[in-house]
């Protein structure tokens, strides 16, 4: 799998290219111990360089990682974390929005409802998923599934990964803002545990619409913001070239968001980002979800709702 190295990873990319070149040379002939030793040394050097680079990433670099084309999406996490997933479609009012997926699944022995944004890999899939930007029918589908989960006393797990809610004319005509607002209101009062995780981009109201929970997590190299760095830069400085400055000023990275008390935990990613090893990223996320769900299941409905209310009301207070 091509890792699609980002600009700041160029030194790592150069080393990996050398490793691949030596590997191909050795593959075609007899086993050469000297080449194998050189490959081992280069791999160690690459790992050391990766640790150094990723130990000091800025908010803009994290933003690039959050959008990495090979980063695992909701449909990559579901089979790695859950079993017996049965997708449920449609909002029962207008259409089935492919930018939001959801359905019943098993988390080990626990039945749950899982809901998440879904982007696409290739052009055809990106168009089908509307680049991960849901329309009102997507959020109404999510709401239908969450209310179903409450009826059957199922915990709700959501995965957030969207640049934002779709801003098209049709979406606005069908009540985009109302759909988002209704989700916020209903999620705040659902009588079942809700665990939300930002796995990539957490873009504005489009993220919040499935992001009101008892526990909110972010993957190590995910972002959460009211607007994209490019959008902010275009408004403040009239140029998207100022996006790195905007990213730092907005504080979009997980560490900065946690300092503000807006999330509960940061889920560690493999060295280099979740796209380097989907299985390890999923295993880390599963462990966090299971631990948090065990804590929430020990609470009564009254305690659950009281804690959720206190969490939400604490935002914005010093």
UniProtKB/Swiss-Prot annotation:
Top enzyme category: transferase
PROSITE patterns the UniProt entry points to: COA_CT_CTER
Entries under SUPFAM superfamilies matching the protein: ClpP/crotonase
The CoA carboxyltransferase C-terminal domain, residue ranges: 34-295
Transport listed as a keyword: no
Record localization: Cytoplasm
Annotated function: Component of the acetyl coenzyme A carboxylase (ACC) complex. First, biotin carboxylase catalyzes the carboxylation of biotin on its carrier protein (BCCP) and then the CO(2) group is transferred by the carboxyltransferase to acetyl-CoA to form malonyl-CoA.
Cited NCBIfam families: accA, AccA_sub, PRK05724.1
Family under the similarity heading: Belongs to the AccA family.
Protein name stated in the entry: Acetyl-coenzyme A carboxylase carboxyl transferase subunit alpha
Organism: Pseudoalteromonas atlantica (strain T6c / ATCC BAA-1087)
Gene: accA
């Amino acid at each position: 799998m091509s890792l699609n190295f980002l600009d700041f990873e160029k030194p790592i990319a150069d080393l990996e290219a050398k490793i691949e070149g030596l590997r191909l040379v050795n593959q075609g002939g007899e086993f050469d111990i000297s080449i194998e030793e050189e490959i081992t040394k280069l791999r160690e050097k690459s790992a050391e360089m990766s640790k150094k680079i990723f130990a000091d990433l800025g908010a803009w670099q994290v933003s690039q990682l959050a959008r990495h084309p090979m980063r695992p999406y909701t449909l990559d996490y579901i089979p790695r974390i859950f079993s017996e997933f049965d997708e449920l479609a449609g909002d029962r009012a207008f259409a089935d929005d492919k930018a939001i997926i959801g359905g019943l699944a098993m988390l080990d022995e626990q039945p749950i409802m899982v809901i998440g944004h879904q982007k696409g890999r290739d052009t055809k899939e990106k168009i089908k998923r509307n680049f991960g930007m849901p329309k009102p029918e997507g959020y109404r589908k999510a709401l239908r599934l969450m209310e179903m989960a409450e009826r059957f006393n199922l915990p709700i797990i959501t995965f957030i990964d969207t640049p934002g809610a779709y801003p098209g004319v049709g979406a606005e005509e069908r009540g985009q803002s109302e759909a988002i607002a209704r989700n916020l209101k209903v999620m705040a009062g659902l009588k079942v545990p809700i665990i939300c995780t930002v796995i990539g981009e957490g873009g504005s109201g489009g993220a919040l619409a499935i992001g009101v929970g008892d526990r909110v997590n972010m993957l190590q190299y995910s972002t959460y913001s009211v607007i994209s760095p490019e959008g902010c830069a275009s408004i403040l400085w009239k140029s998207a070239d100022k996006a790195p400055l905007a990213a730092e000023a907005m504080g979009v990275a997980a560490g900065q968001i946690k300092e503000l008390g807006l999330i509960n935990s940061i889920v560690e990613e493999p060295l280099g980002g979740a796209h380097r090893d989907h299985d390890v990223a999923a295993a880390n996320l599963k462990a966090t979800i299971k631990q948090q769900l065990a804590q929430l299941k020990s609470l009564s409905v009254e305690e659950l709702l009281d804690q959720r209310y206190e969490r939400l009301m604490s935002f914005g207070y010093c």
